[in-house]
Amino acid sequence: LKGDTDGPEDLDRVQELGMKWVRRGFIWESIEREKGVYDFSQYDRFVNDCEKRGLKIIGCMAFSNKLYGHVKDEPARSAYADFAAELVKHYKGRNIIWEIWNEPNTMTFWGRHGKVGNSPQYAREYTDLVRAAVPAMKKANPDCVILAGSVSNMWSESYKWMSYCFADGMLDIHWDIWSVHPYGVKAPEDYMEAYSHTRNLMKKAGGDTGRLWINSERGFPLGKAEGYAGGDPSLAYEYQAWHVIRQYLVDLLEGLPVTIWYEWGGKEGFALYRAGNMTPAYNACKTFVKELSGYKLDYRMKTENKRDFVLRFIDKNGNEKLVAWTAPGVMESPDKIVPHSIKIAVGDVSPRLVTTDLYGRTDIVEVSNGVIEPRLTGAPVYITLR
């Protein structure tokens, strides 16, 4: 959410959709306009409005403040740590977790003082900021939850940047969760290799690979912006609807407890809600929440094709559902998907099972000798077993 989409009406729609988390920048310059004086009033309203609706918050603590200069240097680094400490103290006990910066590996958000992003210099500067901020935050509020990383893109250069951070001691600092923004790949299923590679980097650096992760930002736009997946432009809305659901499912499969879609509103082509209209992606989310509310992922079923996905979900009453789809090849655009049928063993169930498509339309699949043969496409389908 941004300042023009964080009001009560938008939050009502987010709540109605069934989402549980929102991400919002807490901008340092808008809170500390005079040295040592903090005004949280505009964010108090937002936090209160979220709490009324049961929404939890990722608060992104951004950016430098002209009163102090860039946080790569003193006194700005210490002043940022003071600001972060004041934030977690002021909002102690609220449903907020705190992210240190947004995409600090990029020139866009870290600064133009380097020749390129993802550099050893940027990694050292960011690690120094985290090293200053985390102890101050934990002292002010020992229960605060801190996210570090906020890494933009999952590709060779961002992997190098993370390696530089880890070599500089990032993994020895007592933050709680590593956050990533997995742009740079064509499909959500490509996240799996990217996450595995990053875990290996952590392991190589001697870090705890069991530390929590979240995907704190990723969206798939309609046109040629960052994150564009390609394919037939006339099907852009459809592809976006596929991707938002598959992103949530893949992150769930990978053990990420929180996923943030970029973005709720806006004009960049990522929005779920555009100019008062619900996009196909919005409607797909509505079906997703309705179908899987109360269910937990049990396991991924084995398939002959590694790019076919069949996930089994179960609720507390023993009810079971499958979610099934197929993906393009690694780093291929969505139009490369080849729809096909597969055999899935479902055991002793009703002879006719209800299927629900991406937008909530229902159909029937026949069971023969304990096996169904649904047709897989890039759009996840929900299959109710019992």
How would you describe each model-predicted region?
Residues 19, 94-95, 175, 256, ...:
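Core-facing hydrophobic residues within beta-strands of well-ordered domains
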Residues 343-361:
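Solvent-exposed beta-hairpin/edge-strand motifs
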Residues 1-6, 70-75, 230-237:
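Active-site mouth loops of central-metabolism enzymes
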Residues 13, 17-174, 182-185:
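Substrate-binding cleft and catalytic face of glycoside hydrolase catalytic domains
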Residues 303-349:
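Carbohydrate-binding surface patches
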Residues 122-245, 254:
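Noncatalytic carbohydrate-binding groove/subsite architecture in carbohydrate-active enzymes
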Residues 220-292, 298-308:
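Aromatic/acidic polysaccharide-binding cleft in carbohydrate-active enzymes
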Residues 365-386:
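C-terminal beta-strand-rich structural cap/linker in extracellular carbohydrate-active enzymes
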